[in-house]
């Protein structure tokens, strides 16, 4: 694929009120300008920042599929700084992480709460990390519905089904038993980076990057 195929995120970030730095690459054919996120995508770095919702999830999924097509044997690095969000949007990212061939390494920068914490834990074993002052929070899914009594009952059962499934997956990825997960997600459960490592949500706390000599 050509370099023009790299997904551009700058317009979305600018719409949110931010300025996106540009980087200039020199080559035999001259100079080429990239927004910083497109340049990092070339290094197989994806950012999951802000609330997890359908549009953002679609961008993350598209980038993972693109990087798999580029090189199915090289790790993808997913940087997470998210308060959580939609379960269905988050599960589309989760399922893609499990589906594609490359390992997805997850790194928490800032916070990984709710669905953000779930996706952090869903990274490849041995490749899930937090920076030292990151915060992680797990809890049960939230939801609300208005309507007829029967419809409310249907939606209440659905959110209980989702809760049970998320607990099962969290138990699988952390190594905790299901009863522990049920108890610990009953209310907002905040953890430091070191506590998240002890719990099994991540594998290690990054302090300094290990550079190749």
Curated annotation (Swiss-Prot):
**Known partners and oligomeric status:** Fourteen ClpP subunits assemble into 2 heptameric rings which stack back to back to give a disk-like structure with a central cavity, resembling the structure of eukaryotic proteasomes.
| UniProt subcellular location | Cytoplasm
Q: Which UniProt keywords apply?
A: Cytoplasm, Hydrolase, Protease, Serine protease
Give the top-rank taxon of the lineage listed in the UniProt record for this protein: Bacteria
Q: What sections of the sequence does the record tag as coiled-coil?
A: none
Name-wise, this protein is ATP-dependent Clp protease proteolytic subunit
Which HAMAP family does the annotation name? ClpP
One MF term in the entry's GO annotations: ATPase binding
E.C. no: 3.4.21.92
The membrane spanning regions, by residue number, are: none
Q: Has keyword Cytoplasm?
A: yes
Tell me the gene name.
Answer: clpP
Q: Mind listing the GO biological process terms from this record?
A: protein quality control for misfolded or incompletely synthesized proteins
Q: Which CDD domains does the UniProt record give?
A: S14_ClpP_2
Q: Which GO terms describe its cellular component?
A: cytoplasm; endopeptidase Clp complex
Q: What does this protein do?
A: Cleaves peptides in various proteins in a process that requires ATP hydrolysis. Has a chymotrypsin-like activity. Plays a major role in the degradation of misfolded proteins.
Species, as recorded: Pseudomonas putida (strain W619)
Task: Tell me one Pfam family matched here.
Answer: CLP_protease
**Family under the similarity heading:** Belongs to the peptidase S14 family.
Q: Does the keyword Cytoplasm apply?
A: yes
InterPro entries per UniProt: ClpP, ClpP/crotonase-like_dom_sf, ClpP/TepA, ClpP_His_AS, ClpP_Ser_AS
The record places the active site at: 114 (nucleophile), 139
Catalytic activity of the protein: Hydrolysis of proteins to small peptides in the presence of ATP and magnesium. alpha-casein is the usual test substrate. In the absence of ATP, only oligopeptides shorter than five residues are hydrolyzed (such as succinyl-Leu-Tyr-|-NHMec, and Leu-Tyr-Leu-|-Tyr-Trp, in which cleavage of the -Tyr-|-Leu- and -Tyr-|-Trp bonds also occurs)
């Amino acid at each position: 694929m050509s370099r023009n195929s790299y997904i551009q995120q700058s317009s979305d970030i600018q719409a949110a009120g931010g300025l996106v730095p540009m980087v200039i690459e020199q080559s035999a054919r001259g100079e080429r300008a990239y927004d910083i996120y497109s340049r990092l995508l070339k290094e197989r770095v994806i950012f999951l920042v802000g609330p997890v919702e359908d549009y953002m999830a679609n961008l993350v999924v598209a980038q993972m599929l693109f990087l798999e097509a580029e090189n199915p044997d090289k790790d993808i690095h997913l940087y997470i700084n998210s308060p959580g969000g939609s379960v269905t949007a988050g599960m589309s990212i989760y399922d893609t992480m499990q589906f594609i061939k490359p390992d997805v390494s997850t790194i928490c920068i800032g916070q990984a709460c709710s669905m953000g914490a779930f996706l952090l834990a869903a990274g490849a074993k041995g490749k899930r990390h937090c920076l030292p002052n990151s915060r992680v929070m797990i809890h049960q899914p939230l939801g609300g519905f208005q309507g007829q009594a029967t419809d409310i009952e249907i939606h209440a059962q659905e959110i209980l089904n989702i809760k049970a499934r998320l607990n099962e997956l969290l138990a699988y990825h952390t190594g905790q038993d299901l009863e522990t997960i049920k108890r610990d997600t009953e209310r907002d459960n905040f953890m430091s980076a070191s506590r998240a490592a002890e719990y099994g949500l991540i594998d290690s706390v990054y302090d300094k990057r290990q550079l190749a000599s």
